[in-house]
C-alpha cells in the first residue's frame, strides 16, 4: 500500500493537501483509491464497488431481488439497458452478459443538484450486472464515497440524504448478489 511504501498517514496527507477536504476524505476515498490504482493500474477499478454474484443465483433472480429491494426501500427503478442483448441483435454474435439497472430518488437527486450541478453526472444511480471474461458474474456500482467524502464536508441535510442513497444502493447490490429480497 501507499501508506506502507512511503510511511505516510492519511491525516498527514490530508493536512498537506487541503484542510478544506472532509476529515475522512483520505481514509475513505483517496488512500483506498490510490492503493487500488497502484495495485491494478486501472482507475475504473479504483472508483467502483463490486460484489460477486452467488453461483446458485440466476440473472433473473438477481433482477427480481434488486427490483424488490428498490421498491421496499422507496427508490425508483428508472430504466434498464440490456447492452449485451442489444449488441447480439446488431451483430448476430453471442456476447457475455451485461445489463445496467438505473435507480433514482428524484427529490434527493434534485437536492444534490441544487448543491452542485456536477452531482448530475452521478445520476441516476446505476448497478451493472456483468459476466466477466471467466464467466463469473458481478454487480458493479460507483463508489459513492468520492461523492460523499471526497471534497469539502456536505451540509448535514445533504449528507443525510447521500448516506441514505448509498445505504439503499448497497442493499440493492448485496441483495441482488445473493438473490435475497
Where are each of the predicted segments found?
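C-terminal partner/receptor-binding element of secreted or periplasmic proteins
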Residues: 2, 145-181
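Solvent-exposed, acidic/flexible segments
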Residues: 55-63, 94, 158, 162
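Beta-strand/loop substructures that line and gate deep hydrophobic ligand-binding cavities in soluble
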Residues: 126-155
Amino acid at each position: 500500500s501507499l501508506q506502507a511504501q512511503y510511511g505516510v498517514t492519511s491525516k498527514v496527507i490530508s493536512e498537506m493537501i487541503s484542510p478544506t477536504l472532509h476529515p475522512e476524505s483520505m481514509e475513505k476515498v483517496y488512500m483506498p483509491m490510490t492503493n487500488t490504482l497502484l495495485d491494478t493500474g486501472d482507475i475504473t477499478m479504483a472508483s467502483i464497488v463490486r460484489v460477486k454474484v452467488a453461483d446458485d443465483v440466476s440473472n433473473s433472480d438477481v433482477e427480481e431481488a434488486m427490483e424488490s429491494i428498490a421498491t421496499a426501500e422507496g427508490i425508483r427503478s428508472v430504466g434498464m439497458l440490456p447492452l449485451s442483448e442489444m449488441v447480439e441483435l446488431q451483430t448476430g454474435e453471442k456476447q457475455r452478459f451485461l445489463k445496467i439497472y438505473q435507480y433514482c430518488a428524484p427529490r434527493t437527486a434534485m437536492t444534490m443538484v441544487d448543491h452542485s450541478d456536477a452531482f448530475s453526472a452521478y445520476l441516476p444511480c446505476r448497478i451493472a450486472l456483468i459476466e466477466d471474461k471467466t464467466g463469473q458474474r458481478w454487480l458493479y456500482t460507483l463508489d459513492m464515497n468520492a461523492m460523499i467524502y471526497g471534497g469539502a464536508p456536505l451540509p448535514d441535510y445533504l449528507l443525510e440524504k447521500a448516506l441514505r442513497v448509498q445505504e439503499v444502493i448497497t442493499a440493492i447490490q448485496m441483495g441482488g448478489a445473493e438473490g435475497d429480497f
